């Protein structure tokens, strides 16, 4: 999150969204390469991957401390406030920004929806389409690789052509459609076009991040990213029980309706709610601007 904050401070309005996309792509690449390296090093002992991870973290610390320039100028820094040095204090303070408050809520709903993939994708494809574990693994690799391409290449193109707001709306619609197809498709070949819609729909997250960052003062970027990090962590506690329990119920004998796609229907509805909140946030912001102008 300090990385995201620094990225915003060194970005301009023209390249902010592109830079957020690069950071997201970097995280995605790490999630692909990391397990490969860890699995390879594990052959030399169970402690080896952790030792190498510690060395890489130390190298990263040295680079950040000695070579990465401070992005927040001294005259823009504010005094430390213990009341705001926690997620709830930060969120309370962020409420004074009308655009931010509703966007944060929008991000919570879509984050819960996104966790449906990691929670039940393997269970769903094996249950409904009898996929092998290898095919599940290939599909997850497909998601990871294509996500990197989208964040590295497509985000910057769409940001220039559509702008952040329209790009976010497009992302919400594509993701919602992808989830809906997962839920109801009777054909497994349709899963891959649906995956494509879901992955490209990830552009909404990058666009919303850029919008929120551009609406905040420089000396409060770190607080915004920290609060968002805490809330996104909270969604990882909510989503897995919600998605797995609904899947278990509607694929079990106790349910009169057999519907393994129920988690993705829930995800589609949550994404629709996120889209509505996103659009509502701009209406609120526009009304506030008009009232101030009067």
Outline where the language-model segments fall:
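Helix-to-loop junctions at the C-terminal end of transmembrane segments
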Residues: 150-164
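Short, small-residue-biased leader/transition segments that mark boundaries at the very start
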Residues: 1-6
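C-terminal transmembrane helical hairpin of 12-TM major facilitator-type secondary transporters
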Residues: 165-208
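Short amphipathic helix-loop junctions that connect adjacent transmembrane helices
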Residues: 119-136
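A membrane-interface helix-boundary motif in multi-pass transporters
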Residues: 42-55, 245-270
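Juxtamembrane intracellular "pre-TM" segments in multi-pass secondary transporters
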Residues: 69-105, 128, 294
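Multi-pass alpha-helical transporter architecture, strongest
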Residues: 61-67, 265-294
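Helix-loop-helix hairpin linking two adjacent transmembrane segments in secondary transporters
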Residues: 23-66
């Amino acid at each position: 999150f300090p990385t995201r904050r620094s990225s915003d401070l060194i970005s301009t309005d023209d390249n902010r969204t592109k830079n957020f996309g690069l950071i997201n792509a970097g995280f995605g690449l790490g999630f692909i390469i990391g397990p490969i390296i860890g699995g390879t090093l594990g052959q030399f002992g169970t402690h080896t991957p952790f030792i190498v991870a510690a060395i890489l973290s130390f190298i990263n610390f040295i680079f950040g401390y000695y070579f990465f320039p401070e992005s927040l100028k001294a005259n823009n820094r504010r005094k430390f406030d213990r009341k705001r040095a926690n997620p709830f204090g930060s969120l309370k303070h962020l409420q004074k920004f009308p655009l931010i408050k509703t966007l944060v809520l929008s991000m919570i709903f879509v984050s819960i929806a996104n966790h449906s993939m990691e929670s039940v994708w393997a269970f769903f494809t094996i249950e409904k389409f009898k996929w092998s574990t290898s095919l599940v693994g290939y599909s997850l690799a497909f998601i990871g690789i294509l996500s990197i391409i989208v964040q590295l290449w497509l985000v910057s193109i769409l940001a220039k052509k559509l702008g952040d707001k329209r790009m976010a709306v497009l992302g919400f619609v594509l993701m919602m459609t992808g989830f809906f197809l997962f839920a109801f498709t009777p054909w497994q070949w349709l899963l891959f076009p649906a995956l494509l819609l879901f992955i490209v729909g990830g552009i909404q997250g990058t666009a919303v991040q850029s919008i929120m960052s551009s609406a905040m003062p420089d000396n409060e970027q770190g607080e915004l990213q920290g609060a968002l990090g805490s809330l996104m962590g909270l969604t990882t506690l909510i989503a897995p029980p919600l998605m797995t329990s609904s899947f278990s119920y509607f694929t079990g004998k106790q349910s009169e309706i057999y519907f393994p796609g129920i988690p993705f229907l829930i995800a589609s509805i949550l994404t629709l709610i996120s889209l509505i909140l996103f659009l509502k946030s701009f209406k609120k912001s526009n009304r506030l601007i008009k009232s101030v102008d009067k």
